């Protein structure tokens, strides 16, 4: 991945005065994710944010759940310096231990297919309990996003491409949540998307 692409100009464009996703929006998403894992009987004691950008998830966990061990990573040297992340590329790096919650939001569309497959394997290995995953898909690019404020310079794939790979290690719970099959969490049939 070309990390120089994600420089100060990129962050100003997509996370500046009119961000693609605001801190407030991510606060709601993080709270909902945390509560859903609790609802299923899970406990989040560690959280990994991959491609953290401005680090909204990490900031929420540090503020709302200060006992949770948080690691935030990004491929952007700019983001790492500005927001305090570790410089890591999930397509090349696999954490030495799993995390209860792994968050990877709007990252994999920047990777080609081979790198995205490696990243998905590394995300699976990094996840003990639950993965929050989202990536811009070809459908989203055509039908759901504001094309004027979304970075469309990406490798657009179908949702089924991602699902086929994630379903090897996860159960899709919906709303971006994927529960690790080996986690021991029990989802009722209608809590699953399939």
Describe the predicted segments one by one.
Residues 103:
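A conserved beta-strand element that flanks and buttresses the S-adenosyl-L-methionine
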Residues 107:
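Hydrophobic adenine-recognition pocket in adenosine-nucleotide-binding enzymes
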């Amino acid at each position: 991945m070309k990390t120089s692409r994600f420089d100060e100009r990129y962050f100003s464009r997509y996370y500046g005065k009119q961000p693609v996703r605001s801190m407030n929006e991510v606060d709601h998403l993080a709270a909902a994710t945390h509560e859903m894992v609790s609802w299923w009987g899970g406990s989040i004691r560690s959280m990994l944010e991959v491609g953290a950008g401005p680090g909204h998830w990490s900031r929420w966990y540090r503020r709302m759940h200060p006992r949770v061990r948080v690691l935030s990573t990004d491929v952007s040297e700019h983001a790492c310096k500005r927001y305090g992340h570790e410089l890591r590329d999930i397509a090349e790096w696999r954490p030495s231990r799993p995390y209860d919650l792994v968050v990877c939001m709007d990252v994999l569309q920047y990777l080609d297919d081979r790198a995205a497959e490696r990243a998905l394997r590394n995300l699976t290995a990094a996840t003990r309990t639950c993965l929050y995953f989202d990536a811009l898909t070809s459908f989203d690019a055509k039908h759901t996003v504001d094309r004027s404020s979304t970075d469309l310079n990406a490798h657009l794939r179908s949702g089924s491409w991602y699902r086929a790979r994630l379903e090897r290690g996860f159960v899709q719970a919906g709303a971006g949540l994927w529960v690790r099959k080996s986690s021991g969490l029990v989802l009722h049939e209608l809590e699953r998307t399939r």
